[in-house]
Amino acid sequence: LSTSRTFQAMLNEYLPNKLLKEELLKRDYILQNCQKDDSWKGGKLIVPFKASAASSVRMGKLTQATDISEDLYVRGSIDDYREAWGSMIFNHRDLVDHSGRIVEDSFLKILPDTLEDFLDYMKMVVSIQLGTGPYFASATVDGTAGGVVIVDRIDRFSLSQKVTWKGDTQAAADYYVIAIDINLNSVTFSATRGGAAADVSAYTVADNARAYTDDADLVSYQSMRDAYLSAANGGSATLHGQTKLAYPFLQAVNIPGVSWTKSNILDKLFDGYTEVRKKARGRATKVLCDYTVGGAIMKAIENSGGGGPQRGNYQVSVKGKKASLYGWDEITLNTVKGEITIVMIQEWDPDIVVYHDPMSATFRSNGFFKKRKNPEGHEFFELRTEDGYQYIVDTCLFGEMEHTKPGNNGIVYGILPANFV
């Protein structure tokens, strides 16, 4: 018998190479590129906005005093911030075997990188919610009695991950990932951590079975999808406590995308941009999309004829194309109103495209991401069991996205990924 340790005999083995691991892209475009305020200490946050401006103009005579329209001011609010907690655990035995010191040729030298990798993962989870909503994947084939579900976003699953499955009628239940087949887009689930495959046949495509981060089906951050779509098109009826249909200020331009295909993508893209420019205020200069739609856009530009930066009727800006180490790609096109930048991001879904004004939203938080500290200043919590001591490190994010100018944006909804195959 002995106390638990993670690295076991590897502690005393020679490690000339850095840890081999999957490339973890920074899938946090929304968090990285919105305005931020980290001074919110909780409580109700007031979101005041001018719902209507004075509009009384009369030709030839003065407007009667009783007939003058006034500025209309509305008081919206966010009741409190959302909480996201990320947790990691380490075994004390791993440190004891090296007398508390981490030598260079030891597997323990990966610990600092592991903490940073986990923070990147946590940012991805939050950024998905801020962009496209609380669920991160959907079933594309009905679940099986053998625990297998075919999903649309296999890249968002990891071994031992806790996942909540929920359908329109099927109640939510928690499962753990025990196997992943990248090529088949299949994930196998157990009802217990480390257990055998569980029956997940109740979760079907017809019932819109979706995968959520633990408890995200109950509480999640305000998403662009929900904020910009009208209730008729799948969004919420209210935003920051006020009814969207009561005020044009709260209404983003909604554009149906069912007719968007890989063959007409550029025409549809600019038709949508024109529609947003006609109806919206501000400058929606960013087009946010996933790589399915973004890839079709790039192919269409390359295949539209011409040479150099001139591609048929579409002119690539001198900024050209820009691939980012942070996990997104951009291509900038010239328009009659300046430039428009198409941003392809990993944490986006293929059924929506957003024409985004970067100045229209602010993420307000209490210190952004930070490790939990106890009153003694320690950034870990000590746990004692019969198997030894363990240290738990918790990272928290208290905050919420405030959409200060939703009417400046546009959203294309109902895009069919099958149209881009």
Where are these regions (language model features)?
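Core alpha/beta structural scaffold of self-assembling particle/tube/pore-forming proteins
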Residues: 1-58, 72-421
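N-terminal amphipathic/basic membrane-interacting segments and domains
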Residues: 57, 64-68
